[in-house]
Design a protein with these regions (language model features):
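Iron-sulfur cluster-binding electron-transfer modules in prokaryotic oxidoreductases
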Residues: 1-293
Length: 293
C-alpha cells in the first residue's frame, strides 16, 4: 500500500447543506484506503460562482487557497468538479501570466501568503486511479457486486478543457469506468454519457434544466442499467433532487436512482450503508446492496 498520502481538502460549498453524504462517504472511503485529508481552516470558496461577475475576485479566491496549500506543502484534493475545474484553471493562468501573478501576490502578501505555482490540484477520482492505483484499491475490496449494471457520468468540468485539466481523454474517458469495475459492477456504454446533466441551467430555466436531465436519464435507462453513478456533487443533486422534481411535475414513473461513487466503492470496501449515507439520497438506492456477493 502507498504510504504518506496526505492532501489538503478543498470542500465544496454545496455538500454541507445539500449533500452531506458525499463528505461522510468520502471520509469513510479514504480512511479505509489510508489517505489522510488535511483541513486548512483558512480555505475559502474556490471562487467558481464569481467567474462571470468579478474575474479578479474569482482568481484571488482560488489563488489564496493554492497559496495556503503551498504553505503546507500539500497538493489539493477535491471531490467537486466545479472546484476542480476552477482551481486547475486558475493554477494554469497564474503559472502562465507573470503580470497577473504579481498583481494577485500583492494582495496575498497582506496575509503573509505567496503563490509560486508549486502544488497540484487533483480530483478524488484522479487520486484513486493515479496516485493510489487500481491494484492497491483491489487489495482492500472485501465484497463485490454481481450482475450490477452502472451508467457512469463524468461531468463537464473534470474533462474539459483538456489542455488544462488533463484528467482523461474528454472524448473517450475510461478512468471512472475502470474505478467502478473494481467493485465488480459493469460500466455500461450509453450514448449521452458525456453530455451535460443540466445543472448550470437550474434556477435560470428550470424546464430546460429538467429537459436535459430527463433526456440523459431516459437514455441511460435504455442501456439497461440499474443505477447512475457520479463523482460530482452538482451532478448528483441534478440526478437525485431534480429528477425527483421532474418525476413529480411531469407525472413520470420512469426513475433511475443515482449513487455517489464513494457510496458504491464504500460498500465494496465493507463500509455499512448507513455510514455511506445511502438512505440520505432523495431517490431510494438502498436496493444496490442486494447485488453484493
Amino acid at each position: 500500500m502507498v504510504e504518506n498520502m496526505r492532501y489538503a481538502l478543498q470542500r465544496c460549498c454545496t455538500t454541507p447543506v445539500f449533500l452531506n453524504q458525499y463528505e461522510t462517504s468520502t471520509d469513510a472511503v479514504l480512511t479505509k484506503l489510508g489517505i489522510v485529508l488535511v483541513d486548512i481552516k483558512e480555505f475559502n470558496c474556490c471562487g467558481y460562482p464569481l467567474k462571470n461577475t468579478s474575474f479578479k475576485a474569482h482568481i484571488l479566491s482560488s489563488s489564496r487557497n493554492l497559496a495556503l496549500a503551498e504553505r503546507e506543502e500539500l497538493a489539493i484534493l477535491t471531490f467537486c468538479n466545479c472546484c476542480y475545474g476552477t482551481l486547475k484553471h486558475v493554477n494554469h493562468l497564474m503559472r502562465d501570466d507573470a503580470s497577473l501573478r504579481k498583481e494577485i501576490n500583492e494582495t496575498l502578501s497582506k496575509e503573509g501568503l505567496k503563490y509560486d505555482g508549486k502544488i497540484e490540484v487533483k480530483h478524488l477520482l484522479e487520486i484513486l486511479y493515479k496516485d493510489l492505483g487500481l491494484a492497491n484499491i483491489r487489495e482492500k475490496v472485501v465484497r463485490t457486486f454481481q450482475d450490477l449494471k452502472i451508467a457512469t457520468h463524468y461531468g463537464c468540468h473534470i474533462l474539459r478543457p483538456r489542455q488544462i485539466v488533463q484528467f482523461d481523454n474528454p472524448l473517450a474517458p475510461t478512468i471512472f469506468d475502470e474505478l467502478v469495475e473494481i467493485t465488480g459492477a459493469t460500466s455500461v456504454p450509453w450514448s449521452k454519457k458525456l453530455e451535460c446533466c443540466g445543472s448550470p441551467m437550474l434556477g435560470i430555466d428550470d424546464e430546460l434544466s429538467m429537459d436535459l436531465t430527463q433526456t440523459k436519464i431516459e437514455d441511460a435507462r435504455k442501456s439497461g442499467v440499474h443505477y447512475l453513478c457520479v463523482a460530482c456533487p452538482y451532478c448528483q443533486l441534478q440526478f437525485d433532487r431534480v429528477q425527483r422534481m421532474f418525476l413529480t411535475r411531469r407525472h413520470s414513473n420512469h426513475q433511475l436512482p443515482s449513487l455517489l461513487f464513494t457510496q458504491l466503492l464504500g460498500l465494496s470496501l465493507g463500509i455499512d450503508s448507513e455510514t455511506l449515507g445511502i438512505d440520505q439520497n432523495e431517490l431510494d438506492a438502498k436496493g444496490v446492496t442486494k447485488f453484493l456477493s
